Amino acid sequence: MRTTPLAKSSEIERKWYIIDATDVSLGRLSAAVATILRGKNKPQYTPNVDTGDNVIVINASKIKLTGKKASDKFYYHHSEWRGGLKAVSYGELLANNPVKMVEISVKGMLPKNTLGHHEFMKMHVYAGEDHKHEAQKPEKLDINKLI
């Protein structure tokens, strides 16, 4: 009888990838990053094991929002106090904190459990070109070839 080989977290080789977000749609970027973080682009993908790679996203401030999302789409959060609902438009969020906008988008595409949290911790987002992960020798990925 043949059995399917299951991946073990100790046997997985993790790579570092760097993705430039300049003029890339937010949803397409987030979907590609979530796929790499989950490890779905690898042949040894196993749903209950963290098989993904580390991803560095640079130039988050130059991301593209299509349509009227900059003015019509809002990010809501609540302070848990009565009347504490806060709403920030995506255009305002892109101007003030583009890193948070990318993190919210990618986090929504990952599982809502402990494994999803571990996968999310392997993503590093920077608003500009500079990042502090040169020692890991990240491979540059062209986002247009992934989507």
Swiss-Prot record:
Which cysteine pairs make disulfide bonds? none
Q: Does the keyword Nucleotide-binding apply?
A: no
> Can you cite an annotated GO cellular component?
cytosolic large ribosomal subunit
Q: Which Pfam families match?
A: Ribosomal_L13
Ribosomal protein recorded as keyword = yes
SUPFAM superfamilies membership: Ribosomal protein L13
Identify the domain of life: Bacteria
The record's Gene Ontology biological-process terms are: negative regulation of translation; translation
Gene Ontology molecular function: mRNA binding; structural constituent of ribosome
- Keyword tags: Ribonucleoprotein, Ribosomal protein
Job description of the protein: This protein is one of the early assembly proteins of the 50S ribosomal subunit, although it is not seen to bind rRNA by itself. It is important during the early stages of 50S assembly.
Q: Which HAMAP family does this entry report, sorted A to Z?
A: Ribosomal_uL13
Subunit (UniProt): Part of the 50S ribosomal subunit.
Q: Which family does it belong to?
A: Belongs to the universal ribosomal protein uL13 family.
Q: What is this protein called?
A: Large ribosomal subunit protein uL13
